[in-house]
């Protein structure tokens, strides 16, 4: 039986910048805030962390820093994926040596690999790093959609451990849960899908919103895991406005603005991302005010 890397909420950490350099002071404060608020795991170098604009050296430094800062208090999952199989495998190997508890590997994008090619891509990564591998399906970004049939094949590979599902397709979640039951752990990749996915067996979420509200997202997942659907739904409805506005522009633009408004970092992004519009800022401000965050 597959044992989950974590149960509950994992935050897909933002990467704070100051004058185009990684702001480790702010990152350290964000990590401590997350831990104090009861988050269950942390993901570094993911989409929310602007991984595509980080250099290889920056990615390695971020992984090392986060592992060291957490010091075993929660699992650290390192985003190591890419569309170059060898490079993704090497970064995954590095993450393991740095002390990461698992890796998050996005489906290989742009290349349009065959189903067999995608399976082989993940096989090589898993064999290289010998860490729990979380497969990340986000077709809106990658142009590739992993199917329940692909998951079934992946679940037979040692170290292919879990799925972060962000395809928005509830029918496919059911088939994935059926085909991979006991062999791969399912996690939601969208805050707004979390409770629905947990109702069919997902063990939690990799969350964007938990950058801002880690305790609420963690409490929501905990309530659902304990069978308190009423309590979980109450938290979900309270947070629904924020879940929505954090995706009114491309992630992580809104969440970085929100974190800046709360005083955690500068509102600084790397191109080609740019700051959100004044209209979006007002919408985010309203959501933060309604939750008593500013």
Indicate residue ranges for each PLM-predicted region.
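Catalytic cores of TIM-barrel enzymes
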Residues: 2-5, 37, 175-178, 184, ...
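Active-site beta->alpha loop and helix N-cap motifs at the rims of alpha/beta catalytic domains
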Residues: 2-11, 15-143
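C-terminal alpha-helical cap/extension of soluble enzyme domains
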Residues: 5-15, 33, 37-38, 199-202, ...
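A general structural signal for well-ordered alpha-helical segments in protein cores
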Residues: 6, 27, 59, 63, ...
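Alpha-helical structural signal in soluble globular domains
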Residues: 61, 65-70, 94, 98, ...
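Helix N-cap/beta->alpha junction signal
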Residues: 84, 190-191, 277
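Catalytic alpha/beta core domains of metabolic enzymes, predominantly
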Residues: 127, 141-247
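Glycine-rich phosphate-binding "P-loop"
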Residues: 137, 159-160, 270-271
